[in-house]
Amino acid sequence: MSSLFVWLNRLAISAMQRSEVVGAAIVMSIVFMMIIPLPTGLIDVLIALNICISSLLIVLAMYLPKPLAFSTFPSVLLLTTMFRLALSISTTRQILLQQDAGHIVEAFGNFVVGGNLAVGLVIFLILTVVNFLVITKGSERVAEVAARFTLDAMPGKQMSIDSDLRAGLIEAHQARQRRENLAKESQLFGAMDGAMKFVKGDAIAGLVIVFINMIGGFAIGVLQNGMEAGAAMHIYSVLTIGDGLIAQIPALLISLTAGMIITRVSADGQQVDANIGREIAEQLTSQPKAWIMSAAGMLGFALLPGMPTAVFVIISAIALGSGLFQLWRIKQQDSQQQADELHAQQLAPEDNGYQDLRRFNPTRAYLLQFSQEHLNSEAAESLIQHIRRLRNRLVYHFGFTLPSFDIEFSPALAADEFRFCVYEIPLVTATFAVEQLAVRTSSIEIHLADGESDGQIQPGQAERDEHHWCWLPPQHPLLQQEDRRCWNAQQLIMLRMEQAIHQSGAQFIGLQESKSILNWLESEQPELAQELQRIMPLSRFAAVLQRLASERIPLRSVRTIAETLIEHGQHERDSAALTDFVRIALKEHICHQYQQPNGLNVWLLTPETEELLRDSLRQAQSETFFSLAQEYGINLLNQMRSAFPPYDNHHALILVAQDLRSPLRALLKDEFHAVPVLSFAELTSNVAINVLGRLDLQQSPPELQENDPCMNYAY
């Protein structure tokens, strides 16, 4: 036995090495089959081989990842068609001469006829009609359309390959391979368009051969062999039907193979193990609701009178179970995907050892960070919604676009910690999701000095910038006083977030955002936009908008801003001076923005202070600044801390002369970003002024402690 396998192996290797000789021998054998009579034993072998080849082809078509994987199919289709016709000729010769075409033909005929000749003929005709009118006709039309569309799409695909190569998206060898595949694809569908004519002709030839066998056999049996008409009709009908079936069944399988190949839709870069069976299963099970609705329909059929209830109930149960299983599987996949995303979030990109990073990851503009313990918590969701409402309100009222928020749940954060990062640099670090209430430390200092803390008063953490706050339980006696202001953790975060967004928002007014505003102006007032672009470049326009946004001046009055820049931009190039001109033009908006029911609450500078500041003005290349002695700077900051305590409700501002406004704002913006600095030129004629006090730099400053942060303040 082993020697037989060795011999067969050698024979197969030799045949593969001489495949062109084997192919030529097969073609010549098919031709000789049409001429030379074959013994019935050999006919049985060839019929079985024909059925095996057709079965192999249809299974192979199921596993093809794409039509191009079987580019030789048109040639195979031609050979199998010729082989089947040659086999039909051989069996016809044996039927007409010897009333015997082998065991397979007779077995097929007797099995299908089953004692009823009419039934056998009907079944045979149905198979033939299905093959000819349904499968062959449809495949032929699909082949025609596919060939036409493939040829029409070739120039576009060629240009796409060339553009990808020029852009560096693919290498030269990849472009060469794609061009070769494109050429093969066009040849394949063009050849399939012609090869389907073979299938159509084969079906027609099968019908003709059946009629020849039946009529010719009946005539030969009655006229030449002297058989009775009934016996001749029975014998030749059985053999004819058997012969037709052994030809039509492989023809039907080949037609199905051709139809499956040319109707296959495959995407570029499809996985190697993809096959049509898997794709059909995945796509049929992608919509579980359809299965559930079908189950309901089958249940409705089961309720109809006279219907087989059990059959429809079983089918309905199977469909319902399949739909519910698919829903469960989708839910499991979603849960797994969320778990994978959470796992990816927990790992820093540089610590990810599961996959290689292949794309550019820019820093995130706005990032909200929570502890991992708050994933899917109501407190985190509520805070995120409040922060987004705050952002949207600022975008609406101030007219500039802010980036959207990225949310991250980090295991590195404490359970009660919240962070707001700008370009991944923490700007706000706060206490989050605690039951205690926050009060200003200055408001309870007297109680702390008297020793009333009783262990329930927790000072705020300095690393969270909460050294001015204390945390108390909600039922603490100090919170029962009516004039005592307190905030919960979320309210305090919102106060700090509003200032942080205002403080960081100006850096997002760049060239792109300024161009968007200019595009809007072009659509509404094209002449104004054209003149503005003629007067100044986009970079200067963006610098003015950025300065306005940094001082919380709304940008919605685009027309006023543009007209002012056109008026003064012809002789002024400094963006700070242009910003002052725009502020004066927007004085009604500014006064309305800061006006309280009793007017503007302002702090003024003493005349001596104004003179001192004016004498210390220095002009740099791009800006004007104060060159103050250290004691004056310390004195100014201490007076500012006293006049403008954080989160004060007076909504006060500083009112100074026009030449001092911009440098004073630049001096105070780091610590007192929320304090507006206005000039007298920015006041309207009808606004009321409520003076709260005056700042005097010549007052003696208080003694500095060793660790006072003002000791090293640089001016």
Curated annotation (Swiss-Prot):
Name this polypeptide is given: Harpin secretion protein HrpI
Transmembrane segments: 23-43, 45-65, 69-89, 115-135, 203-223, 241-261, 298-318
Compartment list: Cell inner membrane
GO terms classed as biological process: protein secretion; symbiont-mediated perturbation of host programmed cell death
Function: Involved in the secretion of harpin; a proteinaceous elicitor of the hypersensitivity response in plants.
Matching PANTHER family: FLAGELLAR EXPORT PROTEIN, MEMBRANE FLHA SUBUNIT-RELATED, INVASION PROTEIN INVA
Family of the protein in this entry: Belongs to the FHIPEP (flagella/HR/invasion proteins export pore) family.
UniProt keyword annotation of Magnesium present: no
Pfam families tied to this protein: FHIPEP
GO CC aspect terms: plasma membrane
